[in-house]
UniProtKB/Swiss-Prot annotation:
InterPro entries: Alt_ATP_synth_F0_Asu, ATP_syn_F0_a_bact/chloroplast, ATP_synth_F0_asu, ATP_synth_F0_asu_AS, F0_ATP_A_sf. Keywords: ATP synthesis, Cell inner membrane, Cell membrane, CF(0), Hydrogen ion transport, Ion transport, Membrane, Transmembrane, Transmembrane helix, Transport. GO terms for molecular function: proton-transporting ATP synthase activity, rotational mechanism. Belongs to the ATPase A chain family. This is ATP synthase subunit a. Key component of the proton channel; it plays a direct role in the translocation of protons across the membrane. GO terms for cellular component: plasma membrane; proton-transporting ATP synthase complex. The chain crosses the membrane at residues 14-34, 78-98, 107-127, 174-194, 196-216. It is found in: Cell inner membrane. It comes from Albidiferax ferrireducens (strain ATCC BAA-621 / DSM 15236 / T118). It is a multi-pass membrane protein. One of its GO terms (biological process) is proton motive force-driven plasma membrane ATP synthesis. F-type ATPases have 2 components, CF(1) - the catalytic core - and CF(0) - the membrane proton channel. CF(1) has five subunits: alpha(3), beta(3), gamma(1), delta(1), epsilon(1). CF(0) has three main subunits: a(1), b(2) and c(9-12). The alpha and beta chains form an alternating ring which encloses part of the gamma chain. CF(1) is attached to CF(0) by a central stalk formed by the gamma and epsilon chains, while a peripheral stalk is formed by the delta and b chains.
Amino acid sequence: MRLSPDEIIFWQHGFLKLNATIVFTWGLMLVLAVGSKLITRKLSTGLKRSRWQNLLEIVVTAIEKQIEEVGLRDPKKYLGFLGTLFLFVATASLCTVIPGYEPPTGSLSTTAALAFCVFVAVPFFGIKDQGLGGYLKSYVEPTVIMLPFNIISEISRTLALAVRLFGNMMSGAMIIGILLTITPFIFPIVMTALGLLTGMVQAYIFSILAAVYIAAATRGRKPKPEPGEKH
């Protein structure tokens, strides 16, 4: 049983390798890019809309609602980044029904790259919202003594994001593989459905955690209503 798609080598020349992680990652990006282009090329504002547009609107609305529930004031500002994270991880899991496909999220290099994107996005949105001085000030609050601890916190939660997604995806694939080996004719459909569900849950958790980190950096939470204030 393979523990990682990194072990599947399609081409190698010296220290250069083309493994399944790279191939399927770029394949997923191509599918998402081409798919989004095809779906959005004929958008309509009228009553008559295509099934693909209806599906797209449902997905976008659901993602916006989740971003808003985290507390970010303007979900549209973060929709592109957070929506892409969710769709990439979710699509990587949904494609496991294709024979021969290996999800790139089963590789630590992929999950680390996704976590690094979040690591870069947090200060990007924080500086954009508060300015450089306002964002850096958050590292020395409530006192300058907290500076090293806040820096360690930023790095550790990035590592936690990468390891959490990798561990959950790999362990889920291993458990399903073991069960299918033991009972190959009884549980294949059930185990496949369970794997898809696990992947969707991990995509949701990863994107929500990214939204929470961005909300903390931007302080872009909705203000709480004062007592007696009308909603």
